Amino acid sequence: QYEKIGLIPAAGKGERLGFPFPKELYPVIEHNNYKPVSHYILENIVQADVDHIAIVINETKHQLIKYFGNGSRHNCHISYVVQELREDDLTNTKTPGLAEAMDTPYHLTKGKIVYFGMADTIIMPVNFFKIASQQLTSDIDVILCMFHTDRPEKAGMVQLNDDNIVKRIDDKPETTQLEWMWGAVIWKPIFTDFFHDCIHNKQITDYANIFNEAISSGIKFKGVGFEDGKYLDMGTYNDVLRLSQWLKK
């Protein structure tokens, strides 16, 4: 029986939206209550009886720490892990990618079952992690929580066999017949270590490539689809507009 930990990457600069605050704190007003968008994925993780969550931030994200604090107000313990900028040369700093953010808290995630979700997403039902975790049986190493999308060109689309075992991930395909995208992930320590090895020893820093390498190496992925589930992310102004329209419904 492994310990559980949540993992929420929130280290990106979020420059596309140009908000004067971290996009993870974009205000969602529901039933006359304010909740930042990142509160939703935290709730999803806590619903699955996970009481320790690692949030990956960059050195400018003080407001996230101010909002979430140590987690006690949100029924969990929160550890903040700072992902530092890589200096490629003296004049140009590049933000490390998502895969590197997923690996940054390795010292906290190794040896545990990881519940991973993005800080700028709203996913329904609220207990989807709890439901999906029931499929994490002894012969399955990774669970992909899957949702329908009308924009596969922005998503990681999932190829399945008849038993919902994942054959590969097609990342952001221009055209596809695939029905499901992955929106959040649960994984066992075997995948944490594989992921860490890809980043540090194999120089593979694209998460879709790492997923596919893992599948090829025999790590067993299973898809759990939420037929009536909802997945909304906040990558662009169009997404913000969709979120507003969805909340009105």
Language-model features, listed with the residues they occupy:
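Short alpha-helix within the catalytic core of nucleotide-sugar-dependent glycosyltransferases
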Residues: 42-43, 61-64, 69, 125-137, ...
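A structural signal for short hydrophobic beta-strand segments in well-ordered beta-sheet cores
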Residues: 25, 158-160, 223
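Phosphate- and divalent-cation-binding pockets in alpha/beta enzyme and binding domains
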Residues: 16, 63-66, 233, 242
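Conserved beta-strand termini and adjacent loop/short-helix elements that scaffold enzyme active sites
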Residues: 58, 81-83, 145, 169, ...
